[in-house]
């Protein structure tokens, strides 16, 4: 599991930052990539990475402001041109389907794959499979805005090889089935339950993504015990009043969430163009006074998300 920042600017692009997009790479787990918001020129940013558009199977849209969605029509069109694109699901607030369909219709663009739309209305579970579950909750912005919590389900414990050796289980398919927790039958007819040969389950990883919002209790609920929290940081700590007025957060707001909710690593994104160079690094410096595992995200930064412990 890896996370890559394709755009980290707030409102409009700057010389060093494109507008919002995050890629959650689940290649080892699902052979898929999920995008969170698709700002203008996202497909240009993707060209600078190893991401293949056909691997993108799910897109999660936090809200419908232009700097978070204007890249959708172009990306969807290019994904079609490149072929081999399977079904795609877009999760987002009311209006996202209308925006996409209108853009495609007016430009007479036809995509070669089905697009499913899931409208975000209430807090709770929006996706689940055997490996992951995704939850959403309403944030506090000028338009309906949602945060996301991606939860990897617990992983099976390690196979207890010393115990396996006592039963002379041969290498091969039987050992693999035992590791998967299944019941196997040995050549002498003895049955072994794989669950008896596994160590304790290991908790999966949790990634929380918070875009445009004022501080609100829902952020904490989404961020609880997250291995990675990505949080908007439009303003520095001295601009609390301005952040409140414009329905945004400061770097200190993000750091407090991370500190108070047992977060592993905090990444600051959605950075105003006023914070370049030393001013940008100051955001990170100030946030680290509250939560030391804080990182200022830059475009194309790529981080592996490892299992805790």
From Swiss-Prot:
Gene3D superfamilies: Ribonuclease Z/Hydroxyacylglutathione hydrolase-like
GO terms for MF: 3'-tRNA processing endoribonuclease activity; zinc ion binding
Disulfide bond positions: none
Xref: SUPFAM superfamilies: Metallo-hydrolase/oxidoreductase
UniProt binding sites for Zn(2+) 1: 63, 65, 141, 212
Top-level taxon of origin: Bacteria
Keyword set includes Cell membrane: no
Active site: 67
Cited NCBIfam families: PRK00055.1-3 (NF000801), RNase_Z (TIGR02651)
Chain's role: Zinc phosphodiesterase, which displays some tRNA 3'-processing endonuclease activity. Probably involved in tRNA maturation, by removing a 3'-trailer from precursor tRNA.
Family as reported in the entry's similarity comment: Belongs to the RNase Z family.
Protein known as: Ribonuclease Z
Organism whose genome encodes this protein: Lactobacillus johnsonii (strain CNCM I-12250 / La1 / NCC 533)
